[in-house]
Structures are given as structure tokens and as C-alpha cells.
């Protein structure tokens, strides 16, 4: 009898212990025992993916970046992020729809790319803007109309910070705050360069191989990896392979932008798409103190979207519709301006300055933009025209009662009707620059990487978002769609990993 009671007691004790263990492991302790998702790259795509995985799904993340700081190229984005039919547009009485945004995107893509990805990009743009506003308290309350857009839809916040910096700062701060409270939920590892992905015999991800800051080869065990490693706009080697006619141009890309993700994934059997489609941005600033530097500050497209115009550097005359698509404006500069220095003058009114004060002040602090009188503009840039003739040119552009000579669709913040040779303007020298690579690894609508010569996925555990992927923009990306792509497909990658995790 006593033995039976003891046996029952032991069984009950074991049962209770099992229940307690299960309950313990079902909480945050279990999170620490799961293999993390590895996110490669800390630009906006990587930050979006990481925040979504952690905040919505409590899935642990290791964020790896070979650079010494967070942000990638996203942190330098200066015009904003696109969205159609957003609350901001409705508040500012701008009529827009995802369908119109898609029409503009397809027109800019010129028959290249994957239309279903463009459809996703534009349809989910409103929710992307709202996610940034609600999750990270970003205002995104101002709009600009950039080249190739039918209406103003490129969002930025009123305040002192450029949009890329503001967005990256907000998302990275949230990650760092979470990491400080629970290092098991998120680890941020900089100076860590990913060199390979380990797969088992069935093609499932088992680990990420990387070199740590001391040059040691290490393996991070994981079943899911998201490539957010950016494009290849800094790599002369890859430009020579895919777009050799552009290797002589300067670039806006950081030194980390060398196509590592494309190389690794291609070696694993991923399909590459549109690799020859490299965007040349028409306006990179020429530093008057370092004219030959291969790296250029981007002259934000918002400078033209908010009213800036381009003048021929010899004649002082306008020569193009400044709000055409980037490839068209680039072609106009290269074909109509002197070929020996491949430049134009970007000229802006006081009203443009008032609408973009903080950014222009930054450019002025770098000596990239000067505030000068019309007379001084003629003298300093050795224009073969008179100050009076230039005043006439600026007045002609500013006359909203006549059709624009170059069919510019939006004329705002124009020059005063009483402008004179003593009036001041803002001016900078600009030149076309390698800016963005539309090509990359092919993905589907779930952000999964596609296998070469197939529509099947490379592996259920491999995803990509941002500039590392291709097909989202076709032959030419619209300004403001780079940051949008990062948010839309970064969120998508996180949501679909959560279904598999």
C-alpha cells in the first residue's frame, strides 16, 4: 500500500515538473533557446526586418554588418520615401492612388523588372508609411514631387533631420533599446563580414559564415537568413562586368556597397535579374575643393522637386525638364552640356531654400552650394551670357501663365517676378553619378530568393530585401522608392519567416 502511494506521488511529481518546465520554456526563456534569424546588413531593409521580427513576433535576431556603423546607404537618403493615398497626402489635399503610383513605376521601368513586385511595392506603400509613423513616431508630414511622379508622394518630416538619417536613427534606436534590455532577443554585430551560407543536403539553411572584427572565421547557427546587404555601386569590378560604360563615373555609394550578397547567393544558385540596369543619378555635387574625388555627395532630387532648375554651365540657359526620370535628365546633361567635365549648374530661389532649409544649410556647410547674386554667378562660373539675359531666363521659367519650354509638369517656389541682377540665388555644380543598382537576386512576393532558371525558391530559409534584390524597379528607379522598397519587402520577409519559424 505504501509503495503504491509512493509510486503515485512520484508520477504526480514528474507530471507537475513537466508542466512547470513547459510553462517556463514557453516564455522568454524559450526565445533565448531558439536559433536566431540572421539579418545581413543594417540599412533600412535590415532594420525594418529586424524590428518587425522582434516587435511583432518576438523572434530573436542577430544583425550582422561588415561596416563599423549602422545605416548603410539608407542613412544618406535625402529626398524621402514614397507612399500613395497616405494620410499625409489627404491632409495636404493631394489626390493619389496606388494605381497611379504603379502606372508611374511601370513607365519608369521601361518594360524591365517584375510587374507583380512593382504592384506589391505600390499597393503596400500606404501601410509602409503608416507603419513608420505609428511604430516609430515619425511625422512624415511633408511632400515633394520628384521626377517621373504624377503627383507629390515623396514623404519627409518637418524638422532638422534628413529623411534617411531620421528613419534609420529611429529604427536603430528601438533595436538598441531592446538589445540593452534583452540581449537574447537582438544582437547587433558590426565589423562582421558574411562570406558564405551553410546548407544541409536538403538545401536548408544551417548557418551563416562570417569574419569577425579580428579576422576570425566564425559560424552563426541559424535556419533563416535575410540578405539586406545592398547593391554594388561602389564596386568597379562588378560595374566592369555588368555595366562597363559607367566605370568612369563617380559614385554616391559607400565603400561597403560591393555586391557581396549577390555574389554569395549567385554561388548558391540564385537567379540574378537586370544586373546591367544601373541607375545614374543626374545630380551629384562637385566639391570645388576636391573636384576629382570619385565619391560625391548626392544633390537630392528634392532640390529639383521643390523648384530647383538646371542651367547649361557655359550658356546659362535651361536645357531640360528637370522633373523627367533620372535616366532622361542624365542623358540630357551628358548630351547637351560640355563633355569635357560632364556638369551642369543647379540653381534655386530663396523659396526653395525656405522649404528645404536644413538640407541646404548642410550642403552650404560643405561648400557644395553657394548663395550668390546673379552678377556673381555670371563671374564665378564664367558664363557666356550677361546677368540681364540670365534674369530674363529665370523670369521666363517662373512665368506660370505660359507653357514651360521643356514641359516641366510642376513649377513651384519659382524666382520672384521682380528678380534683378543683384538678387541672390543658391547654386551648386552637379554631375551624373552611379547611384543605385536596379538589378540583383530575383525574389518573389514573399521576399524569398528564386533559384536560377526556375520559379522555385532557392531555400525556404533564404530571403532578400532592398537593393540586393532585383526586379522591383526595372530599368529605372523612381526617386523615393528605394526607402519604400526596404520597408515593404523587409516587413514581408519578417512576416513570412514568422510563418515558418
UniProtKB/Swiss-Prot annotation:
Deletion phenotype, per the entry, is: Causes increased sensitivity to hypertonic growth medium.
Q: What else is known?
A: Present with 432 molecules/cell in log phase SD medium.
Q: What does this protein do?
A: Irreversibly catalyzes the reduction of fumarate to succinate. Together with the second isozyme of soluble fumarate reductase (FRD1), essential for anaerobic growth. Involved in maintaining redox balance during oxygen deficiency conditions. Reduction of fumarate is the main source of succinate during fermentation, and under anaerobic conditions, the formation of succinate is strictly required for the reoxidation of FADH(2).
What protein family is recorded? Belongs to the FAD-dependent oxidoreductase 2 family. FRD/SDH subfamily.
Report the co-factor binding details.
Binds 1 FAD per monomer.
The Swiss-Prot or TrEMBL record lists the needed cofactor(s) as: FAD
Q: Which organism is it from?
A: Saccharomyces cerevisiae (strain ATCC 204508 / S288c)
Annotated active site: 281, 304
Q: What is this protein called?
A: Fumarate reductase 2
Q: Which BP terms in the Gene Ontology apply to this protein?
A: FAD metabolic process; protein folding in endoplasmic reticulum
